[in-house]
């Protein structure tokens, strides 16, 4: 029997002066040991003009069709206030995750893909 594959979008965090894409180990362990599934980490794909095409539904749908679920994890970063119409200053936003996850959620829900969310992930949902 094959194990289900669960997609986990990464945060973008600075380590020194370099950006890294990462997911908290507790979320990877929850998928692996708690759910008995295989975690697949998805980088936030960076920024720049060439990245926009990667975020289109025509690019995201084949990726989401290849997995059994989407897990929107918690994070120390916050969603940028522009996403929910606030003019409050952003504290530790992760704009790359925002760009990826909001489009992933729309596509996943349109496809009927199971989505599990905690903390920041629930706010994204």
Language model features: what each stretch is:
Residues 1-120:
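N-terminal beta1-alpha1 cap of cysteine-dependent amidohydrolase-like domains
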